[in-house]
């Protein structure tokens, strides 16, 4: 017997809210992401990359990047324990699962292994404007080739993929550098400790934001910002500071070859720097053979990515489009993707160095950037044709009409609410329907249908009513024989 105190609280109503950092997506966003992925996937497959999908969860020790606490490894990731008391975590990118997959299946994989993947990833980080805890990522990698030409193909594929996704030539660029050049520079500049090297690279990474003078201060004793906060510098002395600044400014408007010449003069005498220079030269040669011009991909010595991750070439995709938000304010998207060579990731599993290189971008971020530039991915929304309902007794006729349209490949629906004519028209408009189909008793008896062209109404509302030829071509409402329904609707949709 249940007491009153044990009765469930039927008055409780949970608040309808999404968790912080997670967003619902409606058709517009999903259509945009699908269009981008279809376009990019077609490019990647032309390059001989095969699709791969791995599970949302990996064992936490396989991820490796976020493991501060062996008792509860959930810093940066969403983790849980399974029934075997093993920690699992939602993947935070698509590269770590690839490394696990490659190590697990290495003996049976074709080598080099070329794959691309896309899907949701999760980050247990503080959310903010435009920063979500779940987002769609697209990733392409070659595992098992140490050739710089493998890096070049990834870069070329990224260039073509972004163009196919809706960024015409001149609206985005791939910037290329090499960690070995940076390491050689650090040695030549006398940066001895790991902390000092990290401070130098972090200073270089701020070149776009602080300019040469600001970076000079951070390379030296430090910098006092506008708020009065002091950032301790790397502690380099005069000549070493000049050497670093000469390197990061070695980029040339004369193209990749001219930049390589400039870099060679700065890093001369460094064995690791010379190795990085040779790799960049081979990347440049391969890109030229692949038809990738200097305005599509260029060498930028100031690019610093993945300070403890990348081992060779690094690259970053930067958006050059002028973008605005919904209020018309200018918005800077900056980097929209990046990648590079990471020869140590698979070795975590095998103990053997396995060369790898790849590129990834955030699909949702790219869709937002395209939209901010006035380029709607996937095209404008187009809802279904809506069949208006007048009388329950005629439901068979309504479904016959909607079936006729669907059989012809036209998206259509019967209105299944209980509202009258005016609310039904408003519903069709909110759905983005190109047209509505009406069958009253008179039309049914006469074997006709009435079609109202909602696209025509929308265009008229935008001030296009003076276009007499257009109005004659697409009358706002017409009654036609029922056997002409499909052709008439197709004419409206094809407009």
From Swiss-Prot:
Q: Which CDD domains match?
A: HisRS-like_core, HisRS_anticodon
Locations of Polar residues compositional bias? 1-10
Organism domain of life: Bacteria
Q: Where is this region: Disordered?
A: 1-24
Q: Where in the cell is it found?
A: Cytoplasm
Which Pfam family name is an example for this entry? tRNA-synt_His
Report the EC code(s) recorded for this entry: 6.1.1.21
GO cellular component term of the entry, any: cytoplasm
Q: Which reaction does it catalyse?
A: tRNA(His) + L-histidine + ATP = L-histidyl-tRNA(His) + AMP + diphosphate + H(+)
* Listed Basic and acidic residues bias regions: 12-24
Asked whether the keyword Cytoplasm is assigned, the reply is: yes
- GO annotation, biological process: histidyl-tRNA aminoacylation
Q: What is its main location?
A: cytoplasm
Stored PANTHER family? HISTIDINE--TRNA LIGASE, HISTIDYL-TRNA SYNTHETASE
Subunit note? Homodimer.
How is this protein named in the record? Histidine--tRNA ligase
